[in-house]
A protein has these predicted regions:
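Bacterial Sec-dependent N-terminal signal peptides
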Residues: 6-32, 203-215
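Proline-enriched interdomain boundary motifs that mark the N-terminal boundary
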Residues: 19-27, 109-118
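Short beta-strand segments of immunoglobulin-like
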Residues: 26-32, 117-124, 160-161
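Short coil/turn motif common to extracellular beta-sandwich-like domains
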Residues: 33-37, 69, 125-129
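Surface-exposed binding patches on compact interaction domains or structured appendages
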Residues: 39-73, 138-171
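A short beta-strand micro-motif common to beta-rich folds, especially ectodomain repeats
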Residues: 82-94, 180-195
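Beta-sandwich strand segments
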Residues: 98-100, 195-206
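Interdomain boundary/hinge segments at the C-termini of tandem beta-sandwich modules
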Residues: 101-107, 210-215
Length: 215
């Protein structure tokens, strides 16, 4: 009942008394994929600050500080990709509280496309960059894509590196082969989302595999 009363008072912008340094209603807030805004209630008896722990182009807050019991308006864009989150960090004196703002996926995993259209590549010994044709509908999640490489043989020194991923191609760079023998690598592109709202373990999806043989 006390929490409910506090929320109503904060929502109405009425002054209330709070005898603790800093408090939030929860550690998680689940956001709809369609986008919008939501009020975050902050309870404090002193000055406080808030920031996003890492920048997110899809989210914004209307203030960076406040005093006493108040609220922060968190705005978020429509999510056309997989689940994502940003963490708000509140601080008052020496106390720190975090709030996970988790946004639901805008696309089902079963509908995700990540297809590399070149099944194999015979690379020259001198190395260099190579473009692979790529078909994906995760065009809003490209920055979170990674390259997964499995090397054949005993020498696992990395020699295949990701340069960039776009909606129509994956660019990798290959080191010069100084081993004196051909070498092979199996390559996939992966994307890891934020998993469930109350978990720090994401779910990873993979593209098809391509084989690279370097002379």
């Amino acid at each position: 009942m006390l929490i409910a009363a506090l929320v109503m008072l904060v929502a109405c912008d009425k002054p209330i008394e709070y005898n603790q340094t800093l408090g939030l209603l929860s550690e998680y807030n689940v956001l709809k994929a369609e986008g919008g805004s939501t009020d975050v209630a902050v309870f404090s008896n002193t000055n406080w600050t808030v920031k996003m722990q890492s920048p997110a182009e899809w989210a914004s807050i209307d203030r960076l500080s406040g005093e006493g019991c108040s609220r922060v308006i968190f705005s978020f864009e429509r999510n056309y990709g997989r689940s994502r989150r940003v963490v708000l960090e509140f601080q008052a004196k020496d106390e720190v509280r975090t709030l996970n703002m988790y946004q639901n996926s805008g696309i089902a995993d079963a509908d995700v496309k990540m297809n590399i259209l070149n099944p194999s590549y015979d690379a020259p010994a001198e190395g260099g960059e190579k473009d692979f044709m790529f078909d994906t509908n995760l065009i809003y999640d490209l920055e979170r894509m990674e390259l997964n490489v499995a090397y054949n043989g005993d020498d696992v020194t990395p020699w295949v590196h990701l340069v960039s991923v776009s909606a129509d191609k994956v660019v990798v760079s290959l080191d010069k082969n100084d081993t004196g023998a051909p070498r092979q690598a199996k390559v996939k592109v992966s994307h890891t989302d934020e998993g469930s709202w109350n978990s720090t373990m994401g779910d990873t999806l993979y593209s098809n595999e391509i084989n690279i043989t370097q002379q």
